[in-house]
Amino acid sequence: MIRRVALAVACLTAPLAAQDAVVRGRVVRSDDGTPVSAAEVRIRQTGPTTTTDTAGRFELRGAPTGPVELEARRLGFKPTIISLALAAGEARTIEVQLTATIITLDPITTTATREPRSLANVAAAVTVADTLAIQRGRTVGLDETLRMMPGVQAASRFGTEDVNIGIRGSSSRSRQAVRGVAVLLDGVPLTEPDGVGRLDLIELAAARQIEVVRGPISALYAGSASGVLNVISRSGFDSPGATLEAHAGSYGFEKYVATAGGALANGKGGGYLAGSYTQADNYRAHSEGNVARGLVRGDYRPAARTTISFDAQGSVLDTKLPGSLTQAQTDADPNAAQPAALFFDFGRADTRYRMGARLAQGLDATGEVEASGYFYYGGRTLDFPIPGQVVDLNFHRTQVGARIRAAEVGGAALDLAAGVDYDNVFGTDQRWTNSGGGDHGPRLDDGTDAAAGLGVYLQGEWEASRAVAFTLGLRYDAVTFNFTSAFPGKIPSQERILDQWSPKLTTSWRAGAQSLLYASIAHGFEVPAFGELSPGPGAPVNAQLQPKTLWNYELGARGSIGTKVLYDASVFYADVTGEFVPRTVGGLSVPENASSSRNIGLELAATVLATSWLDLSATYTYSDFRLLDFTSSVLLPDSTRQEVVYDGNLLPGVPQHRLTAEAVTRPLRALTLGLRFEWQSLVYVENGNQQEGVIYVPSTQPPGTTPVPFRSVPARALVQLNGQYQAGPVGIFATVENLFGTRYTANVVGNSDLGAYYEAGPGTWVSLGVRLSAWPKGF
């Protein structure tokens, strides 16, 4: 469980006054003078906000002259307000003391619901990870942070690049990307119109905050039948100064990071940039890889209630892919590569970029009406050797969106918002024969792929009282797929349009300052991916594969008990039509629709602030995801196929029970130590839910099949240690994963036609790192 602390999210629409003073200093505990990290510090009159670092330091630029009030707050502490009188051009240094008190939900802010707001007012299952939680690991993959959250499955597939992330079972069919989850970077979708979310552009070391919303948010975002993952990057306002990092560890792991940020003296502008390079041999054969990433961000506030943000990201990745193994291969050597991966030289050489701007503008003098928008352009090139072919893609992407919001409409406690999103991915798709070694042989296809998504949404929020609120939202999505081919013998042109209306109704009751109860009914919508609809631009489109839709009914509660305990709970029931049941044919994802299925889940989380130096947290996830009406065929020993009914069986690839626990202690002011524990129950690998059995795969030898034994993945437990020592500008950190060297399967490839269900996790591995920081003078 991530410790919920006060997180600063600067509201883009906050009014700005004349700004020409600077306030900097430290936030400490009133009882022992210990630095308070991740505390929110702001000027109350104007809204400039920042967050303290690990040493409790902060800097606020653009403070107005004259009398002002500075407020500091953090979860578990009583807010402190200090009155100041600032002169033009003054740089004031102060110390702010916070006193432990009853916990309230107000300081926690999330933007994943399209509006910056307190967690106390979000009627959804939301978890937020702050900077300290993000930087506790190697900052290589999002799994390092997300796997401790309830309702989330997250694991590294091969070591440094491919991360399998799922919310409420969506990872069951994930192969080379995130499915069923809308992945956002600073609120703008990375997930493409076909529902595929790639994480290449996310540099975790440059992330300030990670927000996860569990459950369908299709009323706000496309491709979010299971939830939303929003990564907030750093800016020059909240991350002034420069850092250099170097990491090294087991399996040839190395990572280097450099960042720099700063803001103008008048507080109207700021910039931030980051670059990283990661390489590793990794723990499985044929899985070595490297990736370079870069990020540039600029923010400009030319006038009151006007904010313009520019950013660009790029990544260059080159990695080998070892493939999945059968049970016999796993028993012999779990770190081996699939023989076909070696022969065909499975891998991914992927270059991506994205650049654009976001604008927020107040439209009236009262601050009740505002408009915002974004425009981004990007692209990617991909060289992708797979069984029998090499896929070469050269795609472009255009994204544009606009939104208008009116608060207190008609003088009532009613907020209305309307918006539109357009997202178009298009480009060339060429296929070549792969006769071995990943070399380009004779051409197999030469065409184009395109997916254009259009979404229009409306949302109304009504505060019936100070305690009770209602939200009603409705979104229409249409995704148009186009495939063309100029290759002889292929289908010249094909089109398929998938659309859906997605409503959502929520109500929340805030029971005082310490708890929130909510109920929601929401519709979810998820479309198939390019490769799931058609194996190539000129191949027939699978007209039988339909979108997945669901109705989700949910009850939840979050809050605190006294000054020591925070809790979060949600229970849900989902009626699903067209569930994507995982199936892998020839190494490619070819899912099938289940006519109907139902999901029942329970997600619990608790954090105990036991002492000033010890935090304890735990999560529990129960997932009973069952197929109610589903029939599929299996290969028999005599090479014939037989239809089998799987009604009542569990969806493969999803553990029914998952438990995490964490203890974080600070024995010294500069030293933080952490102990993590993860446990999950057995996982079925095929639709039959057999703990062991045999499947038959095609063979060139009589009788035309070969038996391949398999077993379900047994329950497993993992333990991790981490530590960080901060001495002024020098930070030293270490991680020990899989402390006891447990042999386990990290990921399951469900219903593989070759019985290759298993991708092993690593044994014990160690990483060490050092970070050097330089802050502006006086900071």
What do the predicted segments below correspond to?
Residues 679-695, 724-779:
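C-terminal beta-signal and adjacent terminal beta-strands/loops
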Residues 172, 181, 188-214:
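Short acidic/polar hinge/loop motifs at secondary-structure boundaries
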Residues 126, 143-188:
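Extracytoplasmic beta-strand/coil segments of soluble accessory domains associated
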Residues 250-279, 284-322, 345-368, 410-411, ...:
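Transmembrane beta-barrel wall of Gram-negative outer-membrane proteins
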Residues 368-384, 510, 516-522, 547-631:
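Membrane-embedded beta-barrel scaffold of Gram-negative outer-membrane proteins
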Residues 93-96, 142, 164-166, 181-184, ...:
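N-terminal periplasmic accessory domains that precede
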Residues 28-31, 39-42, 73-77, 87-135, ...:
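Short, acidic, small-residue-rich periplasmic hinge/interaction motif at the N-terminus
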